[in-house]
């Protein structure tokens, strides 16, 4: 049995989509228990494997992260994180304030001893449909080569345990594929990655080929990773709007759009990274999953499923035994 703590109040569409996702999750997974934190006036579920706990406060999207965690002690996010810290829950899921959740993860759940800096990881789509693991996408704006090596080690574990990939291929995001390309960070990182024979490091990868499906894990610093992630999100939205405008521009195109409707829907599904769940803060003493702030019920459900798999696979213990202890 896996037990998850969930923030009912976080996100643009909370609590409705959270309640819908939680209801579906406990119906689909008979080995899942949930502790739900939020406002009792907005709670309307009744299930033997859902325990509800009232919280008098809520962390807003515009709140300053660290201050909110310190001052709003009875918020749904803080209480959720405390449940993981105490060992009462195996992991947690929230669609709330990203900075506050990372602060709660770092200061409440706690960092694994030996992990220099936790990394935020997300699974992004590829043209072949298999996707790839991408980190860091914003936990740390600055990074040293040693941090990128550790990100690769964390990503390697994540790809194996969560995505079921044996001996995943690890790549370093760079401006060229040649070993000597890049700045001092990527050059030194390349050397360290190449020297770690526990990793299947296959070299540099350029941003233009990220979605080709040639690798399983891509490592970069949080500043670059966050910009790449937002660029991909924006590009996907722009392409979708351009396609819609083109289809609606003439009767001929509308007919073609109707014929291709099923294929276009399948394409949209393949490119929707909410299918893979949320982003995960790796390197902590518990599983912390960040669902997108604008998540619908399907996306939040995927994040719950992702946290459940992490609990089943005991990913935190694996990180302690490999990345943590090896760096003490």
From Swiss-Prot:
InterPro entries, per database record: FA_synthesis, Phospholipid_synth_PlsX-like
Any one Gene Ontology cellular component term annotated for this protein: cytoplasm
Protein's name in the database: Phosphate acyltransferase
Documented EC number(s): 2.3.1.274
HAMAP family reported in the protein's UniProt record: PlsX
GO molecular function annotations of the record: phosphate:acyl-[acyl carrier protein] acyltransferase activity
Family of this protein: Belongs to the PlsX family.
Catalysed reactions listed for this entry: a fatty acyl-[ACP] + phosphate = an acyl phosphate + holo-[ACP]
Function (record text): Catalyzes the reversible formation of acyl-phosphate (acyl-PO(4)) from acyl-[acyl-carrier-protein] (acyl-ACP). This enzyme utilizes acyl-ACP as fatty acyl donor, but not acyl-CoA.
Species this protein is from: Staphylococcus aureus (strain MRSA252)
Record-linked Pfam families: FA_synthesis (PF02504)
Assembly and interaction partners: Homodimer. Probably interacts with PlsY.
Keyword annotations from UniProtKB, A to Z: Cytoplasm, Lipid biosynthesis, Lipid metabolism, Phospholipid biosynthesis, Phospholipid metabolism, Transferase
Pathway assigned to this chain's UniProt record: Lipid metabolism; phospholipid metabolism
Residues spanning the membrane: none
Places the protein is found: Cytoplasm
GO biological process, alphabetically ordered: fatty acid biosynthetic process; phospholipid biosynthetic process
